């Protein structure tokens, strides 16, 4: 569940069992969006943080870049608050640590402004993809998400999906 929310600071503190979809539903009326999450919204925040998942956001990298702090429960029952500045070694060991350090119980996340996007689909030969990405996607200021997927048996024709901001 949501523990704290500040639309003006663009932050939210949640229990680790909440799904990304529930967060987005909660913040959407405030014109906000999750800053970084994996492609699908049905995963839990705790699970996503424990593997330091990534999405298809251009220029943002893995989910750790949007995490302000976590509450971590160690195997012996000790509870620690951790962030980049406080207990940083626990923060960076837990995010992407697959539960080896402890269980992430809560997380404070950065949010972003919510923008309307348009989905663009393309198929092309795999040999043309690098030039397409370099020339059409990488420096496009409107491009928000992008990925190219290969599906059997068409391993030479990626399905390209881009989402771009619209006015």
Predicted regions, residues:
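C-terminal substrate-binding/cap subdomain adjacent to the FAD-binding core in PCMH-type
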Residues: 68-167
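Short, glycine/charge-rich beta-strand/loop segments that flank catalytic centers
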Residues: 36-49, 68, 150-152
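Glycine-rich N-terminal segment of FAD-binding domains in flavoprotein oxidoreductases
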Residues: 1-42, 51-57
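Short loop/turn motifs at secondary-structure junctions and domain boundaries
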Residues: 33, 61-65
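Catalytic micro-motifs at enzyme active sites that drive phosphoryl/nucleotidyl and oxygen chemistry
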Residues: 56-60, 90-93
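Flexible loop/turn segments at secondary-structure boundaries
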Residues: 20-22, 43-45, 111, 154-157
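Gly/Ser/Thr-rich beta-alpha loop segments that engage phosphate groups in nucleotides
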Residues: 19, 48-49, 57, 63, ...
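A structural signal for short, hydrophobic beta-strand segments that form beta-sheets
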Residues: 2-3, 64-67, 104
């Amino acid at each position: 569940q949501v523990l704290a929310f500040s639309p003006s600071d663009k932050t939210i503190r949640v229990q680790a069992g909440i799904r990304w979809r529930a967060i987005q539903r909660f913040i959407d009326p405030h014109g906000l969006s999750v800053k970084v999450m994996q492609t699908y919204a049905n995963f839990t925040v705790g699970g996503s943080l424990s593997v330091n998942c990534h999405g298809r956001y251009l220029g943002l990298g893995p989910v750790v870049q949007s995490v302000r702090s976590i509450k971590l429960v160690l195997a012996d029952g000790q509870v620690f608050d951790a962030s980049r500045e406080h207990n940083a070694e626990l923060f960076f060991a837990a995010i992407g640590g697959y539960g080896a350090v402890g269980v992430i119980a809560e997380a404070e996340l950065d949010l972003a402004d919510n923008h309307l996007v348009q989905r663009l689909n393309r198929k092309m030969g795999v040999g043309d993809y690098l030039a397409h990405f370099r020339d059409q996607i990488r420096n496009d200021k409107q491009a928000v998400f992008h990925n190219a997927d290969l599906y059997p048996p068409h391993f030479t024709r990626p399905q390209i999906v881009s989402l771009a901001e619209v006015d």
